Amino acid sequence: MAIISFTNYKRGQTTGCMSAVMRYTMQDKKTEFEGQQLVTGINCQPESVYADFMTTKRLYHKTDGVLFYHMVQSFPKGEAVDPVTAHAAALKLAKYYEGYEVLVCTHTDREHIHSHFLICLLYTSPSP
């Protein structure tokens, strides 16, 4: 069974912090499985996720304070779940954030498979 946790940035969030976390979570060597990158953008594009989040923030005049939420869904070491199934479970969980921009990146480089969710703080509209 997966567990969910949220990452707290004790020194606060900056645009530099957000950009660094996005780069970390999308690393090819962490998200690759059988030639496929387990990276999905919901209401945003992975290739331009930083610009997408910042455009939304500027539009709503919310460019300071909490910039994003960072959630992690982890499966225990030895859990019989493959990376594709873990990513599908992560995408199903991300549907609960309908109307938000969400980046989902499933990491396969550890003994425990886990997915990172970077969620833009601002609700924009429901997905089509």
What are these regions, as identified by a protein language model?
Residues M1-S125:
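N-terminal nicking endonuclease/strand-transfer module with a His-rich metal-binding environment
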